[in-house]
A protein has these predicted regions:
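Extended intrinsically disordered, low-complexity coil regions enriched in Ser, Thr, Gly, Ala
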Residues: 170-173, 183-207, 241-243, 248
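Sequence/structural segment immediately N-terminal to covalent heme-attachment motifs in c-type
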Residues: 77-102, 107-117
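Electron-transfer interface patches adjacent to heme c in soluble/periplasmic c-type cytochromes
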Residues: 92, 113-177, 183-186, 214-225
């Protein structure tokens, strides 16, 4: 009798291990479902950098702000012009090569490469020389080893009277240049006889632009190249007149 009473006084769970296992499984399942429900209801938190749209918008606005020359937006996509300005002026330093060199790239005390008395090293605002901005004419010669040394000049990137960039190039031509380096002017062909100071000796290829970093630029996206073209179409025309480099002349009227 006492044994029966003691037996009945023991908790039922101790007498039913299978029931205990079922309760643990049920509890675990309930906890898992609760966690999943909470995770679905909890808003996701964005981490990392801005979205591509945010970054592009920032570049567009900055590009429009730093353009050193007045821009012509007529019949042009202003957003592409802004993005193109950012690439040309803040990333690629196109004017560093496509002007006449450091001595004329900037004006007076606005030249960061020169001392700016009485304050010593440059500490003020840069002032780009708009008279030479992207007008080409930087001499990368002498180039080659023959007696008549060749001088290579950076090309004029400003639009002509048609409003097309780089002296009247179509976008398709401009795209081809940046993708392949093709020289549409073909002003320095390969030498076929005695070097005359204008032709290129092997192994250099007279069909492509030398010095220009098109092997790097060819990896740019179509949209970025289009933006550069749009910007170069919006800047003022410059007629660069340098003896021995008629290719730099531009019909602005």
């Amino acid at each position: 009798m006492n044994n029966r009473l003691k037996l009945h006084s023991i908790p039922a769970l101790l007498l039913k291990p299978k029931s205990l296992s079922k309760m643990w499984v049920a509890s675990a399942a309930f906890f898992t479902i609760a966690v999943l429900l909470v995770s679905f209801k909890t808003p996701s938190v964005k981490a990392g950098p801005q979205t591509d749209n945010d970054l592009n918008e920032s570049k567009i606005q900055l590009g429009l702000a730093i353009a050193p020359v007045p821009l012509n937006f007529e019949h042009r996509n202003k957003r592409l012009v802004g993005l193109g300005s950012y690439i040309v002026n803040a990333q690629a330093d196109c004017n560093g090569c496509h002007s006449r060199g450091p001595s004329t790239e900037y004006l007076g005390p606005g030249n960061p490469y020169l001392l700016s008395p009485p304050h010593g090293p440059f500490g003020g605002m840069q002032e780009v020389n708009i008279a030479t901005y992207l007008g080409g004419g930087r001499d990368f010669g002498p180039f080659g080893s023959h007696s008549e040394l060749l001088h290579l000049y950076s090309r004029n990137l400003t639009p002509d009277k048609t409003g097309r960039a780089a002296g009247g190039l179509t976008y398709e031509q401009f795209l081809t240049i940046l993708r392949t380096g093709k020289d549409y002017d073909h002003i320095h062909p390969n030498c076929t006889g005695t070097p005359d100071g204008n032709c290129l000796l092997p192994p250099f290829n007279g069909d492509v632009l030398q010095v220009m970093p098109w092997p790097v630029q060819q990896h740019m996206s179509d949209n970025d190249i289009r933006a550069i073209y749009e910007y170069l179409s919006a800047i003022p025309c410059i007629d660069t007149n340098i003896a021995g480099a008629p290719v730099l002349r531009n019909n602005c009227n």
